[in-house]
Amino acid sequence: KNFGQVKQEATELWNKELNRVRISGGTDDEKTIFYTAMYHTMIDPRIYTDVDGRYVGGDYKIHTADSTFTKRTIFSGWDVFRSQFPLQTIINPRLVSDELNSLITMADQSGREYYERWELLNSYSGCMLGNPALSSYV
């Protein structure tokens, strides 16, 4: 594939994702603002596996992803449990399921008895108050 083909495929994939919500009315500028905000809600949590399904687990060992969900990373719990995750639960429940299963897998692999508040590249950042991951499960 050449660059133009890859660009076209990426445009089509993003348009498919962004069209999960369709709006009417408003100016072109307002629509641009809305869909830019939608795009920002879809950047993370991102896929964490390599092309062969392997990833570094919560125990810092190499694991192969389970085929029942897509292993994801970057859960900034305090920032997203009241906004991004309720929205994604409605428009993309598979993504939310993937992230919650990823947090469970990380806790199981690491032996920790809690879900990470701000998981970053399958590591514990140890910051933020409370445990917003629990609110995302409910």
Model-derived features: positions:
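Acidic/polar, glycine-enriched structural segments that form the non-catalytic walls/loops
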Residues: K1-K71, T105, E113
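Alpha-helical support elements that line or immediately flank enzyme active sites
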Residues: F34-T49, T73-S97, S135-V138
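Helix-terminus loop motifs that line ligand-binding clefts
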Residues: Y55-D59, H63-A65, R94-S136
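Residue-identity detector for glutamine
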Residues: Q5-Q8, Q84, Q88, Q109
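Amphipathic, alpha-helical segments enriched in basic
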Residues: K71, F75-W78, R112, E116
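Alpha-helix capping and helix-loop boundary segments enriched in small/acidic/polar residues
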Residues: G25-D28, T70-F75, L87-R94, L120-P132
